[in-house]
């Protein structure tokens, strides 16, 4: 049988499907997620249920968002899970997660994310950060390194700044390719994202911060002065105490927020 077939389902490349099969890893992830009935538990991309089954067993109801119609049908007919699940068939990148919030309950979101959409999905989820208590995701190890990077690190970029603006980022464990069927060509890792109740560096307009980061990191090897010359003058960099000769990966989240807030003040 092809290595792409697992539990009778053929992994679909266009959906980025690699199914988690290592029980030890599954148990550790479920322990990190800490399922409970005090939150709305939400799984993105339940796949064949490696995380779905142990999480659903521990709680009264689990909401899942799954794009693959074949997998949705399997879940709807699952002898154990069908009565525990609220299933939304659709694209998580387009999904309005705020509709899942109920009074007095924030979301706990988790999933073994398709690696081909993980970065845009992170940006989408940050828009709902105020409604989310915790997020636990299996990602390409390289993406976890980007999420958790420090200034000056080559992995530090736009995703880093936006993730650390919204959340505390905690790498949880590394997962080798043989823990999946079929094995991916890259190493994986689990990350915990804890949205801030109060942001350490509040931004006056997060859209300005997002655009500033996009512009700054568009040409990583060039200086801030070069990349942001249409946005901030040398005098304004000096006022902020930021050296415009530095490269974008050398600037902290706090400094990016300070620059964005200055842009907001100029636009007011």
From Swiss-Prot:
Its EC number is 2.1.1.182. GO terms for molecular function: 16S rRNA (adenine(1518)-N(6)/adenine(1519)-N(6))-dimethyltransferase activity; RNA binding. S-adenosyl-L-methionine binds at residues 18, 20, 45, 66, 91, 112. Its main location: cytoplasm. It catalyses: adenosine(1518)/adenosine(1519) in 16S rRNA + 4 S-adenosyl-L-methionine = N(6)-dimethyladenosine(1518)/N(6)-dimethyladenosine(1519) in 16S rRNA + 4 S-adenosyl-L-homocysteine + 4 H(+). It is found in: Cytoplasm. It holds the Pfam family RrnaAD. One of its GO terms (cellular component) is cytosol. Keywords: Cytoplasm, Methyltransferase, RNA-binding, rRNA processing, S-adenosyl-L-methionine, Transferase. InterPro entries: KsgA/Erm, rRNA_Ade_diMease-like_C, rRNA_Ade_Mease_Trfase_CS, rRNA_Ade_methylase_Trfase_N, rRNA_adenine_dimethylase, SAM-dependent_MTases_sf. It is an enzyme of class 2 (transferase). The keyword Transferase applies. It comes from the Bacteria. Specifically dimethylates two adjacent adenosines (A1518 and A1519) in the loop of a conserved hairpin near the 3'-end of 16S rRNA in the 30S particle. May play a critical role in biogenesis of 30S subunits. Belongs to the class I-like SAM-binding methyltransferase superfamily. rRNA adenine N(6)-methyltransferase family. RsmA subfamily. This is Ribosomal RNA small subunit methyltransferase A. The gene is rsmA.
